[in-house]
Structure formats: C-alpha cells, structure tokens
Design a protein with these regions (language model features):
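An N-terminal domain-cap segment
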Residues: 1-3
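An acidic-aromatic
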Residues: 6-54, 124-125
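Short, surface-exposed charged micro-motifs
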Residues: 6-8, 23-24, 69, 99-103
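Short, functionally important structural connectors and interaction interfaces within domains
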Residues: 19, 52-56, 62, 96, ...
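Residue-level preference for alpha-helix termini and adjacent loops
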Residues: 26, 41, 54, 59-63, ...
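Short secondary-structure transition/capping segments
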Residues: 28-40, 63-76, 117-124
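Flexible, surface-exposed loop/linker segments and immediately adjacent secondary-structure boundaries
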Residues: 47-82
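Gly/Pro-enriched, hydrophobic low-complexity segments
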Residues: 71-154
Length: 156
C-alpha cells in the first residue's frame, strides 16, 4: 500500500499548529485542541506530567537525541540536494519501530526526510518539502478561539 498525504506545520518553541488530513491540531503550550471539521468536533486535552503527548511537531527536530543508537547510512542526491542519512536504532528492543532513517540536507543542515521502518515491516516516510525560519507570526497565532467554530461539539 502506498499512500501520500501532505500537510503544514508551524512551530514556535513548544507551541505548534498542524494541519493534516483535513484536521487541525493546535498546542498553545498548555492544551492541545484538535479540530475535525468533517465531524464538527473539537477535542481539548492537557498532557499529564512527563507524558509523551502523541504527535508533537515541536519535538520533530530533536526526538532522536534520547533513546536511539545511531550510525551513518547512505548519502544520496535527491533533486540536486545532497542528503546524508543516519540510521537510528531504538535502544529499547521492545519498540514497535525497527529503525529510523533520518535524512539531513548537507548544505542546509536541516532535516529533509524521516523514514520509519516498523517492526511489522511497515514503511512510513515524512518529507519536509519546505521550511521557513525566523518568520513573524501574529501574537494570537497559537491561540484557540472557540467562537470561530459555532455549532461544533467541544469535548473537554
């Protein structure tokens, strides 16, 4: 099975706004708001102390610093860019992930691609096709406004 989807994410510190598969997820630093327009539903949740809070784009760029052993892998030319892959092997053998391949753009020194190989052989690829840095955002960009969603069911 091959399936491709795209989305956008904006990250500032620990706060983020993710738009993916028709839904929006917003983390304002304290709570996560997941808006699903198809169902007209909003779920609001708070992370517990020390909890890994599921998808967290703000951790995407440094998740590998703990819990993985790593080694150099292949270097590829991708669309004129030199991408150096690093193989990340989970320290915990009971993980559902066999290994990850983290592709680094050598010139930009940024993550270009993340490939996850599951213990069951499933392959998931995330490609960061465009990254903008040091952009100005409105002060309320990461603020949830319930009035923008009239008639939505809000699940606390």
């Amino acid at each position: 099975i091959k399936q491709e989807t795209s989305g956008t994410v904006t990250v500032e510190g620990s706060r983020y706004k993710l738009m993916y598969l028709g839904a929006e997820q917003l983390f304002d630093g304290e709570k996560t708001y997941t808006v699903v327009p198809e169902n007209e539903e909003i779920t609001i949740s708070s992370p517990e102390e020390g909890e890994d809070f599921g998808i967290n784009p703000s951790k995407l760029l440094n998740f590998y610093k703990e819990g993985y052993d790593y080694q150099w892998d292949i270097k590829q030319n991708v669309l004129g860019r030199t991408i150096q892959f690093v193989k990340l092997i989970p320290s915990d053998e009971n993980k559902e992930v066999s290994y990850l391949l983290l592709g680094i753009d050598v010139l930009k020194k940024s993550i270009y691609r993340l490939i996850e190989i599951g213990a069951n052989g499933t392959r998931t690829t995330l490609t960061l096709s465009n990254q903008l840095t040091n952009i100005s955002l409105a002060t309320d960009y990461f603020k949830f406004d319930a009035s923008s969603y009239p008639n939505y069911y809000i699940n606390n």
